[in-house]
Amino acid sequence: MATPNAQSGKITQVIGPVVDVEFPPGALPDIYTALSVTNPAIDARADNLVIEVSQHLGENTARCIAMDSTDGLVRGMVVRDTGAPISVPVGKEVLGRILNVVGDPVDERGPVASVRKFPIHRPAPTLVDQNVKIEAFETGIKVIDLLAPYLRGGKIGLFGGAGVGKTVLLMELVNNVAKKRGGFSVFAGVGERTREGNDLYHEMIESGVINKDDLSKSQCVLVYGQMNEPPGARARVALSALAIAEYFRDEEKRDMLLFIDNIFRFTQAGSEVSALLGRIPSAVGYQPTLSTEMGELQERITSTKNGAITSVQAIYVPADDLTDPAPATAFAHLDATTVLSRKLTEIGIYPAVDPLDSTSRILDPLVVGAEHYQVAREVQETLQRYKDLQDIIAILGMDELSEDDKLTVARARKVQRFLSQPFHVAEQFTGNPGKYVELADTIRGFKEIVEGKHDDLPEQAFYMVGGIEEAVEKAKKLAAG
């Protein structure tokens, strides 16, 4: 075993994913520095395990968190100081690839050709560099653009159980931002199932978001730190994905989409790491640094003069308790919420975005304009009235309603169906060509429905269409039989 020099130390203790390393006097590495050690239990490569300095214990000892398995490490092994934080490859060479927390490819397609690397720990853009203009981020998805518009450079919370269409919605957003804005997307799989990560990769290949034959034509990068990884990897993988997105925003001046699935697992991993480091837990057993860690991640996701990173974050709510410190801390940073409803999937409305539960900070006449705001509120009012009447309809039937209420119900059912939309990424399953609907067309379509311009058309004409003209055409075809 090599004798330690000024840039290397020796392992003195290994407790699970926590490794203590002793350095010669005066050679202690800074906090967040990446150290490397050869772990023969992982594979035959040298320096194959990265550990990150988290604490200075005194007596020239650094306490570190491992980014991979520590099985196979023994006391006395030599640890090399890399002199820099964990850095990941960036640039167009990473498009279409699956990377892990330290930027190594895990898709068995050879090494990443990128020559540039970005550190995963970076300061948030300064106030001077940030873009203060509040503008909506058009997605081309009617229900989102009308009722819960996304803020460019904002953070959106995505709520929904299993099988309600989170993945398909994410892929449609990736597709639309690439085709309409020339932007790329980065997907961070944080502490979720490996099987789901694999499914997503293959679905992206099928839908054309990742081009397997020519990776340079891909629109997305996948960065995974899944459930089976040590907590160090799960606590850092979101930062690795963010560094890749920051490169495209700052150096290539692109609009980026950053998906984090799941932001709760980021907090959960931080809690595990905190306990292993011996910190005294805070409320409900979470780490005392919960707000700081969340803030350091979220403040880097913003709009600058170069471009914007708009983030969509899936949020798991433990035991459906919205006051739990983990989701509650994430809520403080959100600009909009998109809630997916199982009831809508049961009646075949896709995307199953709940029009009454989803919210947005920028649905304000000063931001989106008076007409957009007015139409959105009228749509919600109509749907809310329909919801209130559903009990009466279930007990007494439609005939017992007043004429006004019958009209409201008819319009609400048309609105509900018009909120559905065929997706490009689902084309090969449904046979319906996908539709991107411009915001102006969305507003006009819903305005005409709530004003009663299309009261004579059957409600099925509004199902799975793009703009209102398409619904009118569909009605003509239905009438012609």
UniProtKB/Swiss-Prot annotation:
Q: Which gene encodes it?
A: atpD
Superkingdom to which the source organism belongs: Bacteria
EC number(s) on file: 7.1.2.2
Keyword Ion transport assigned: yes
Q: What does the annotation say about its assembly with partners?
A: F-type ATPases have 2 components, CF(1) - the catalytic core - and CF(0) - the membrane proton channel. CF(1) has five subunits: alpha(3), beta(3), gamma(1), delta(1), epsilon(1). CF(0) has three main subunits: a(1), b(2) and c(9-12). The alpha and beta chains form an alternating ring which encloses part of the gamma chain. CF(1) is attached to CF(0) by a central stalk formed by the gamma and epsilon chains, while a peripheral stalk is formed by the delta and b chains.
| Catalyzed reaction equations | ATP + H2O + 4 H(+)(in) = ADP + phosphate + 5 H(+)(out)
Top EC group? translocase
Q: What Pfam families does the annotation carry?
A: ATP-synt_ab (PF00006), ATP-synt_ab_N (PF02874), ATP-synt_VA_C (PF22919)
Q: Which InterPro entries match?
A: AAA+_ATPase, ATP-synt_VA_C, ATP_synth_F1_bsu, ATPase_a/bsu_AS, ATPase_alpha/beta_chains, ATPase_F1/V1/A1_a/bsu_N, ATPase_F1/V1/A1_a/bsu_N_sf, ATPase_F1/V1/A1_a/bsu_nucl-bd
Q: Where in the cell is it found?
A: Cell inner membrane
Protein name as it appears in the record:
ATP synthase subunit beta
What job does the chain carry out?
Answer: Produces ATP from ADP in the presence of a proton gradient across the membrane. The catalytic sites are hosted primarily by the beta subunits.
Q: Give the main localization category.
A: membrane
Family, similarity comment: Belongs to the ATPase alpha/beta chains family.
- Organism the protein comes from: Anaeromyxobacter sp. (strain Fw109-5)
Q: What are the GO MF terms of this UniProt record? A: ATP binding; ATP hydrolysis activity; proton-transporting ATP synthase activity, rotational mechanism
| Membrane topology listed for this record | Peripheral membrane protein
Q: Which residues bind ATP?
A: 160-167
